[in-house]
Amino acid sequence: MSHYKNKFLCRRSSVKCLSLFLSLYLTLAPGFAFALPSDPTVRNGSVSFNQVDSKTLNIIQSSDKAIIDWNSFNIQKNEATHFQLPSANSINVSRVTGGVSSSIFGTLTSNGKLMLINPNGILFGKDSRVDVNGLVATTSDINNSDFISGNYHFSISPEINRTVINRGTINIKQGGLLAFVAPGVENSGIINAKLGQISLASGKTFTLDLYGDKLVSLGIDSKILNQVIGPDGTPVSSLVANGGSIHANGGNVFLGVKAARNVVDQVINMDGLIEAQTAFKKDGKIVLLGGDEGLVKITGTLDASGKESGQLGGNIQ
């Protein structure tokens, strides 16, 4: 098999330039199954794509904000996708429009903030590793002009009933943020965000506050009315579930739901670990918000204690 490097530059209103390279690569290597993010269209901003080899894709963004529509966004085991952004506060929106869910089984990295949107669901597999400054993974969408203007309001079609699930390891840089928002959200892996903000929320509409104390605010019309379907095609038993471990020492962790009665057995199931201990003299905070119509089941560990002598610790609500 031939090995080579190629680059393509895409700007606003560009053609789907990377697809030309992918077609050429598959022609030269007919036995190869390509699974990296494919067929991008840049809707806003300046972005280039560097296909390093058969398992590595680099996305280089030179504008502070950019929007890319992808036909598919998958990363298989032993594959890697990296987003290089101008700064830690720069943001990339990657929206999947091809009608299939996203499976992240390899490595996803960025020095900035990524917003991954797929109405058909997102799964981070058990061998996946994510290292970013910030990550928003959601089945809801945002208007392009709202994103560019800084109005981070997301909404979802009534028929969407899919999930965002993490079974791997996600590391958020110190002081960064992570938000999973979908009709169903689950963490059975590891999430680390020291001094950061973590939100796992079930809802249809929400607003992001990237710089305030409350990362995710669920809309008043955000209530889940229908069964939510997991990646295996069966209904989920909880709208927000944490059976893994979440570490946000010195930061905030929020688990929230807006749901109608009898949609699931329990709206929140917390049988894992949430740790938001005091760090660098900053108290941690853990909030579980189940609404008025659902059962919040806690059989795991919530820890917002002080780590050092004399520290009182944060609070749990």
Predicted regions and their residues:
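Extracellular and secretory-pathway beta-repeat/beta-biased strand scaffolds
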Residues: 2-317
